[in-house]
Amino acid sequence: MKALLLDKAGPVSSLYVGDLPVPEPGAGEIRVKVHAVSLNPVDYKLAGRGNENWKWPHVLGLDVAGVVDAVGEGANQWSTGDRVFYHGDLSKAGGFAEYAITTAHTTARIPDGVGFAEAAAIPCAGLTAYEAVVRRLNVQPDHIVWMQGGAGGVGGFAVQMCANIGAAVITTASERNHEYVKSLGASYAIDYANEDVVARIMEITKGRGVDRVLAAVDEATADQGIEVLAFRGGLATVAGLPQLAESTFDNARSVHRIAYGGAHTSSNREAQVDLALMAEEMIALVAEKTIDPMIEQVIGLGDIPAGLAQLETRHVRGKIVAELV
């Protein structure tokens, strides 16, 4: 099979298209004929540092959509021909290939009317946003929420979810993306490059601060998130933990860390099954046209290194998806 290969940890420019044997599913696993994969920042980060459990050459790619091609022993909930998608285990071979292996219990079904590219765009960014907005932050209609990086994958999904709930959404984005994030549901867009973000948020909220923050950029913006949280506010972070001062706890603020890699590496089956449950809930929203998967670019397998290099600039709007079929 054709696959995008990495011979050793290094820059995305070292990725190349090569040949590998078609893998066979083990007990509790299925083989998927890959139709589409989406690109995520975690892909270039993993390429750069590697993983002690990888076998070389390694195949990256965590967000996969395709058709069940073979079923391993005990994976009887799936049949060949089923349309599926999943968020993969970063310690194992991924989906930047014509065929991929995944665990049956972490896999979700693609409903009629949803394409493979749309499904592939969901897992990493969509599940992160869902976990933060719905599970951890419990965003309510009367909340004011700061969703950082609203033009990106995680931020874009989160902006839409909060707007659908009825919350007022403030987001940060470059000026060229202001109309875009407002089209997703943001009430206010702040130019992080040319405005004092903290001062602008406090102006918008009349000094009160926001009820919820999703820190999706870096540790510095996570620190800003703590700074603008109102009394009993909550922050969820995927970008590193903020510095926590005593005042954080004096104001009864809470901090939540989102990390999906742990669901696989912890051997916590309940958490792994939950990946599939959340994926089913997310793709139902896409099927209902309640959530837009925000596909901005569709590329081929050989274009993935260039796509990942784009992601490294942190100036990509929405999602990049590679179609293999």
Predicted regions and their residues:
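Short glycine/proline-centered loop/turn elements that form peptide/ligand docking sites
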Residues: G48, E73-G74, T171-Y180, E219-T221
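C-terminal substrate-binding/catalytic core of Rossmann-like NAD(P)-dependent dehydrogenases/reductases
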Residues: S247-Q297
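Glycine-rich beta-strand-centered segment in the early N-terminal region that forms part
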Residues: P21-S38, G48-S91
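Glycine-rich cofactor phosphate-binding loops and adjacent beta1-alpha1 units
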Residues: A189-I258
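Mid-domain Rossmann-like dinucleotide-binding core that forms the NAD(H)/NADP(H) cofactor-binding site
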Residues: A120-N194
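NAD(P)H dinucleotide-binding glycine-rich loop of Rossmann-like/cofactor-binding domains
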Residues: Q77, H87-G149
